[in-house]
């Protein structure tokens, strides 16, 4: 019947895709060993209806924060391959799964915003989405994640379409009792100018207002 035919085609497609990837990697192990060790996941096979329509409407994620040198596998074909932490290629991969008018959100370490080591991922994100909203949170006295994670966090929200804008917040320091109200307190400030790949400052509304006043005064 049709269901069995579909399953057979899916199995054949998965096998041929695995064979192609195995050859591309020049892996000395057998195909079966490579599949067992790598556990390849083929998005277009697992979600055919999604990719017929161009990708996911919304992609939301919390990628792993792990130094590249500490993982025992390799990844290929990413513009962000040389980033120190694997959250960068995870951000890139997630973006590639999004449809042309889709929306995107990732929670990542604050290094995404300012570190030179992650300039490439900022360039990639800026080239893929038009509107960026980035909120930033300290780890003291409280943090979004448990203390063992030990990171200051940036929540990156983006969408495709519309004029290119970047909005950021100040670095929020907060107590645990504020957690349920934290997002209600967020204030974004639109960056007056920004360059693709450049660090995203976190001036906050008050400092931005002061800058604008100084600029206006000098223009008079």
Task: Map each language-model feature to its residues.
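Signature of N6-adenine DNA methyltransferases within the class I
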Residues: 42-220
